[in-house]
A protein has these predicted regions:
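Conserved acidic segment of CheY-like receiver
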Residues: 2-11
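Short hydrophobic/Thr-rich beta-strand motif most characteristic of the beta2 strand and flanking loop
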Residues: 26-33
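Acidic, metal-coordinating helix/loop segments flanking the phosphotransfer/catalytic sites
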Residues: 33-48
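Conserved phosphotransfer microenvironments
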Residues: 51-66
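Conserved phosphotransfer cores of two-component systems
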Residues: 67-72, 93
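A short, hydrophobic beta-strand element within the central beta-sheet of small alpha/beta folds
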Residues: 73-82
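Alpha4 helix (beta4-alpha4-beta5 surface) of REC/receiver domains from two-component response regulators
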Residues: 82-97
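Output/docking surface of receiver
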Residues: 94-106
Length: 117
């Protein structure tokens, strides 16, 4: 079982998340598409899911489909601080928390640690 499932296609952020997870003892599953993200959440039942809302893997659609299926895994999304419309769309799609990349990066270790088994 993994602790956290992440939808991200930005290699810089992927590397940052993977390294922080390693340092905090969190097991991760990294997904590049919305379909893989949903399938992994359904299979692994993680404590947390993280979404790069700028992912080309269909982030908003994946959030909507996940919530429509009844899945209540806590979801955190991150994006550029100027993308207020995207932030509102993510919240409407079922994202529990949406934050700017800077806040996500600054708090990544504590975010991941909160999902420890």
């Amino acid at each position: 079982m993994v602790d956290v499932v992440v939808l991200v296609d930005d290699l810089f952020f992927q590397a940052k998340i993977v390294e922080t997870a390693r340092l905090t003892g969190i097991t991760l599953a990294i997904c590049g598409t919305g379909d893989a993200f949903i399938a992994t959440i359904d299979r692994e039942s993680p404590k947390l899911a993280i979404v790069d809302l700028n992912s080309r893997g269909g982030a908003l659609n994946a959030l909507e489909r996940l919530r429509a299926s009844g899945n209540q895994t806590p979801l955190i999304g991150y994006l550029s601080h100027v993308q207020t419309e995207l932030a509102e769309s993510a919240k409407a799609a079922g994202c529990n928390d949406v934050m700017p990349r800077s806040k996500f990066t600054a708090n990544l270790a504590s975010i991941l640690s909160g999902a420890k088994s």
